[in-house]
């Protein structure tokens, strides 16, 4: 289930970004899309002069993207924040026992930490929280997160969509 959610989540994130949904919505509402900000993307093929520097960057970037970020973010969100806002005795609260406040906290974190991709973040963070509530397994969230991030990394290199880097 985690693998499937990771793939679906990655496809949704990439699709939302390719369609530029956030900027379109802001424009339709009469607001400037610049208000959302953008990530400072880097094209590693232009930035690094030597091939060894490029390979080191890509290996490090993918290790961070696929291993470090999913573990750290899921520990903070699922291991702490969602349970903390649900119950003062959060250490003893099982993963699947979080309620609406926990769901809102996790999704709110995702939206606030990815403002230029907030629609994708809203959908993705909700999906991963629902996965956690269904399976009650922390590592399912990490696996789904890793797969989504891996898909995003491959997409970024393939499409040269450096704003997502």
Locations of regions flagged by a protein language model:
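Transmembrane helix-loop-helix hairpins at the membrane interface
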Residues: 12, 47-165
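Interfacial transmembrane-helix boundary/kink motif in multi-pass membrane proteins
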Residues: 1-19, 23, 27-38, 45, ...
